[in-house]
Amino acid sequence: MHFLHVVQLYYPVNTGAGRYFAEVGERLAREGHRVTVLATDAYDLEYLWNPARRRVAAPEEVHGGVRIVRLPVRRAPGPPIVYPILRRLMVELSRLPRTEPLLRRLALVTPRLPAMRRFFAAGERFDLVHAGNITLDFAILPALDFARRAGAPFVCTPFVHLGEPGDGSLSRYYLMRHQVDLLRRSDRVIAMTSLEADALAARGVPPERMRAIGVGVDPREVAGGDGARFRAQHTVAGPLVLYVGALARDKGAIHTIEAMRRLWEAGSDATLALIGAPLAHFTEFYERLPAAAKARIRLLPYAPDEVKRDALAAADVFAMPSRTDSFGIVYLEAWCYGVPVVGARAGGVPGVIADGQDGLLAPYGDTAAIAGAVGRLLADRELARRLGAAGRAKVLRELTWDRIYSQVRQVYEELTERRAPRAHSETRPGL
């Protein structure tokens, strides 16, 4: 069979959504199926609205047995701020009834992919279309229209960021009227957690079309870290608290630093290591930190995977109190090393971390509570060991990529087998 995956940022870009589609697509390719990925030429997410950021030059290549077609991004005239202004306008319009048609048109103003229409017009046949990341709807809306015209089943993995309980300031960018309508019209919606599925069902997405599957890790790929090497190379003598993720306020990077400053003031000798790509507001925050705080921090932006594995092997506690994770693969990576995790009670994270059983949760942005959770794990090593071991057991039992893929594959089978009697089923190899 021939599957089309639509994902806005893909290899060589390292994103959670890109990894998800790569794990599914490359396994399909190994089974003998054809997989085409339609991506943009953005390397940095910000390139979608800011041409000064990085892009991927190659228009097409094959990686992991998957054909990648990169469509050039085009933007409306004006400075980069046009995009966030437009999205805020759309959020406000979404408060009004019957604005779905207008919102769909506005979603395609900027960024846009004129080459996508030409790609679809070329007549290439696909047995199923699977798109992801609902907030970047400029690529998903045309894919759904194409699937409907072609008679192909359409699957969406929206990666909805639910934000903090009772606070819709983040989720409203993922749950606008036209976005929810798109999910209602999808043949299947793959949610990260039951929390996300429940939120979508409350907005009218049919529960019988949803599957809460999530993401996974490959423990063999994560293994091999050398904690002693990390400690020697980065001069870490005592306990190590690790953060891995985009260095941004919404991801909890700033709150983690502020929580650690509380612990340092209370006498803790722990070191904080931060690995990830820094956003501009984080860099400004970090530059204003006093020298004494910087001396306790190991800032490692853009560290390679080998360094990340070494850091995981060296860590005593992993903390990423984010509100913008629909799942959070990096918690699973920490668990592979038996490291206890601290997350925020926001987004899909409470559907991943069982508070008090395999990790600890704190309210997003509550630096006192975050400090309390990290400090508790540093002080009570038996609790830390028990939570880390429980997390590792959960990963091996439920959250490997092989298990996740088998569930996604089952969704594909449901849809393609239902369609098979129509149009050329006798010439297609089955899943």
Predicted ranges, named:
Residues 4, 190, 235-261, 273-275:
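Conserved donor-binding/catalytic core segment of Leloir-type glycosyltransferases
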